[in-house]
Structures are given as C-alpha cells and as structure tokens.
Amino acid sequence: MDMKDFGTITSSLELSKMFEYENPFDFKKPTVQMLGRWQPWHDGHTKLFEKALTLTGQVVIMVREVYGIEGDAGAGRTVAQTDNPFGEIAVIDGIKKGLGDAGYEEGREYMIMAVPNIVDISYGRGVGYTFTEHDLGKDVHEISATKIRAKMREEGKL
C-alpha cells in the first residue's frame, strides 16, 4: 500500500477495511497504546492488555522491530535489551494467539502495528495524552520473558 492511498480515507471504517478487519476499529475513539518487544508475549502481557482495555475499550499494540539486535541500549536507556530471538511475524502471531485464547478479537478490542525500534518517546506540554504504569501485582510482575526464553532454550525450543 502506498502512503498516498491514505489521502482518500474519509472514515475509520474505510481505514479499518484497509487493515482487513471485519469489525471496525474506531480510529477516532480514544485508544490506549502498548509499545514493546513482546519477546515472547506471555500471561503478564495479557493482564496488562486487559488493564489497558478497561481505560478506553480498544488498544493498539505496537511491536518494536528488534529481532537479533545486539549492543547499544539506545537513547536514554541504561540497559541494552539484546535478547530478541523472535522476529516480527512470530511476535505478532504470539500476540494474536495469547489474546485469542483469552477471548479477544483483533480488529474489535485491539489492533497490532509493527513499528521501528523506538527507544524514546518525546513530547511537549499539553499534548492530550498521558503515560501510565500499571501495578498488576506481585504474581503478574514475577512473570518474566527472560525466564521464559531461558526455559525455551533449555528445552531446545529456541
């Protein structure tokens, strides 16, 4: 799809059709953004999604393109996130499976968007949105993608 195609869009329904969603995702409705590596998607991410969904009723999950990245932590980061064994398609498939198993439908409650390796979000004052960190409790915070990847390696699945 060429970017010029977006110039003729007159409604979120038309935009939803371009993304092949059967149930229109309302592009004008307030929406929560979740940005991450999701290496891999796990139950803690699903709990975060469910919390985010309560805020507006729809969520855009942004998948950072980080497959195979080594080295530099990036702008303003103190710790490099270099263990990125899953490519974009595998990550997106994992998100769809995890949320599908929990009863959520892409295009209704959420959409997935691949984005560059975003390492900083800059904004000015009065921009009309907030940054929210959700405390999901000790049990959820103990779920660790690092531990999941280590176990997958031990079992020869990665």
Where are the predicted features?
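Nucleotidyltransferase catalytic core that binds NTPs
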Residues: D2-L158
